[in-house]
Regions:
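Tandem CBS (Cystathionine beta-synthase) repeat/Bateman regulatory domains
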Residues: 1-152
Length: 152
């Protein structure tokens, strides 16, 4: 009987040590956001609402980074559609996304830590934040879901 209990205790300790290591790795808030950033849909701010919505549907995404001359000028999300577009009599072919985007959004650098992204999201009420290089060229985006998944 003692051997059985010793074996069980040993197995429990091994499982606990594995779980602790997994949790420590999963909640490394100091990790750079480039470790969980994914690519982004980057479009000209002159793109029609129809094209943006079609791309959202086709690519199963809900966020576009908008540019002017290759530099970030805004962000447009599903939430912008709900709050600013739906219910208005608009010609989606003629309307430009720049009239409905969030101008000059908060941005992050790929080397910024996950904790910094989380702080910006909570303080600003953002669900998505563009990631740019040092010259404000979009290189990705991070969502609150990315952060939550990273935390475990």
């Amino acid at each position: 009987m003692d051997d059985f209990l010793d074996d069980e205790l040993k197995q429990m300790e091994e499982r606990e040590s594995l779980q602790e290591n997994t949790i420590v790795e999963a909640i490394a808030l100091s990790d750079p956001i480039e470790s969980l950033s994914k690519g982004c849909l980057s479009l000209s701010e002159d793109t029609s609402l129809r094209e943006v919505v079609n791309r959202f549907q086709k690519e199963n995404i809900g966020c576009a980074i908008l540019t002017r001359d290759g530099k970030i000028s805004g962000i447009f999300t599903e939430r912008d559609i709900l709050l600013n577009v739906l219910g208005k009599k608009l010609d989606f072919e003629k309307e430009s996304v720049k009239d409905f985007m969030t101008n000059d959004p908060q941005v992050l650098l790929p080397t910024d830590p996950v904790s910094f992204a989380l702080n910006k999201m909570v303080d600003g009420g953002f669900r998505n934040i563009p990631i740019v290089d040092g010259e404000l060229n979009p290189v990705g985006q991070i969502s609150i879901l990315d952060v939550v998944n990273h935390l475990g």
